Regions:
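Mature N-terminal segment immediately following signal peptide/propeptide cleavage
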Residues: 1, 6-24
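Surface-exposed patches in mature extracellular/periplasmic domains of secreted proteins
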Residues: 22-30, 100-101
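Solvent-exposed loop/turn segments at secondary-structure junctions
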Residues: 2-4, 43-46, 78-80, 136
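Alpha-helix initiation/capping motif
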Residues: 3, 29, 41-43, 75, ...
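Short, well-ordered secondary-structure micro-motifs within conserved domains or adaptor modules
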Residues: 26-53
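Short hydrophobic beta-strand segments
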Residues: 1-6, 33-42, 72-73, 127-132
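Feature activates predominantly on carbohydrate-active enzymes
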Residues: 8-12, 16, 54-200
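Intrinsic disorder/low-complexity segments
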Residues: 11, 22, 42-49, 85
């Protein structure tokens, strides 16, 4: 059973491919035996490649791979599958999502793919540009943002939430406990290490 983000990934792919190619693309639960297929998600990928593995991908790692009978777009977790779809649309078809209301979706009636074998795990676990338009859940997911300020629902694969968010220096490193032994961890004001009203 596909997760909400994997279902959303397939729907987004079909929507954008329809815009790009100018013809209908449908989401199907079973592969078409006479046409090339795009396999979205790790379970679908195993239909195309029986030894397909998500080992080492974590929640957000992606695989974009051509196979003899089509294309695999899958991730280590549901959010990873969504990111695989958006990365494919961006890197191989030229889509861009500039803001929640402005995007570039090119017209390509014919799409030819060379061999692709991409396996990528994001270097940064938490990605959150902090500006109003970035809080839009669709824009955030399409641009692979996953911070707690974004309006990301289950269909977007959720988000990372860290306790404290901001203004957390003293709760994390209480000066009563650490200042005497590690003054270098605290602000230097006019050449003096201080902890009174010196941190956010």
């Amino acid at each position: 059973d596909a997760q909400p983000a994997e279902k959303h990934a397939a729907t987004e792919l079909a929507t954008f491919l329809t815009q790009i190619a100018g013809g209908p693309f449908a989401v199907a639960a079973e592969p078409n035996q006479t046409l090339a297929n795009i396999y979205v998600g790790p379970q679908a990928a195993k239909i195309a490649q029986s030894d397909f593995s998500t080992d080492g991908l974590g929640d957000e790692g992606i695989v974009i791979r051509t196979v003899p009978n089509g294309l695999i777009l899958a991730g280590g977790g549901p959010r990873g599958t969504l990111y695989a779809v958006y990365t494919f649309l961006e890197d191989h078809l030229g889509c861009r999502w500039w803001s929640s209301s402005e995007s570039t979706i090119p017209s390509k009636p014919t799409v030819v793919l060379n061999d692709i074998d991409v396996r990528y795990v994001p270097v940064l676990e938490y990605r959150e540009p902090y500006w109003f338009d970035a809080f839009d859940g669709d824009w955030a997911a399409r641009n692979k943002c996953n911070g707690q300020g974004h309006r990301l629902r289950a269909e977007h694969g959720g988000k990372h939430i860290y306790e404290g968010f901001v203004h957390t220096f003293f709760p994390l490193i209480p000066p009563q406990k650490y200042f005497a032994d590690h003054p270098e961890w605290f602000s230097e004001i006019d050449g003096q290490r201080k902890h009174e009203r010196a941190q956010l």
